[in-house]
């Protein structure tokens, strides 16, 4: 992780730990994969991969949505996604559930500091063991998230918040627009 921090520092990049890895860290659950977001993600992921002499795989090369994976060990990956929006708060607003819409600067994560970005109350929902959709059209925007709510509830032992459950019911027909491969991938995670 120090080599990742050094790579970000060399490139003057503000790097954030986000998503399920951060969530699981705060739940004291084992975590072999970590997700990161920043501006300049392609350059950073490649620099880090070179520094640790591990493969770097491009998962999505769509401009502005680039996602790369560095295979850190045989059973551990670091995924890097281009920051969505102008700020970390704008990025977090586009994520599926409040428990996945939190971010911590890598330096703070490594130092065990407590500062973090949580604009939608994800930490509170972790404590309450709730799956709550982020505000806005996040479930309608990607209907696969309807299934993800149930997967998270089952794997984390959480309850789905009532309004989120109502949204799932309201948007359930949208699942028919999701590619079968994406659904299968979600079901086998």
Language-model features, listed with the residues they occupy:
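Catalytic cores of the polymerase beta-like nucleotidyltransferase superfamily
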Residues: 1-189
């Amino acid at each position: 992780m120090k080599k990742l921090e050094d790579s970000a520092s060399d490139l003057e990049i503000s790097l954030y730990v986000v998503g399920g890895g951060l969530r699981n860290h705060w739940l004291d659950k084992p975590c072999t994969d970590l997700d990161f977001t920043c501006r300049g993600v392609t350059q950073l992921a490649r620099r880090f991969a070179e520094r640790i002499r591990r493969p770097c795989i491009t998962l999505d090369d769509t401009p502005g949505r680039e996602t790369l994976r560095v295979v850190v060990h045989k059973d551990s990956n670091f995924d890097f996604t281009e920051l969505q929006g102008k700020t970390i708060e704008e990025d977090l607003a586009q994520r599926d559930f409040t428990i996945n819409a939190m971010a911590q600067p890598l330096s703070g994560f490594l130092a065990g500091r407590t500062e973090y970005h949580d604009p939608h109350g994800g930490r509170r929902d972790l404590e309450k063991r709730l799956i709550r959709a982020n505000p806005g059209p996040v479930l309608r925007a990607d209907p696969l998230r309807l299934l993800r709510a149930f997967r998270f509830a089952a794997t984390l032992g959480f309850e789905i918040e009532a309004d989120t459950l109502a949204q799932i019911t309201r948007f359930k027909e949208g699942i028919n627009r999701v590619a079968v491969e994406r659904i299968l991938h979600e079901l086998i995670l």
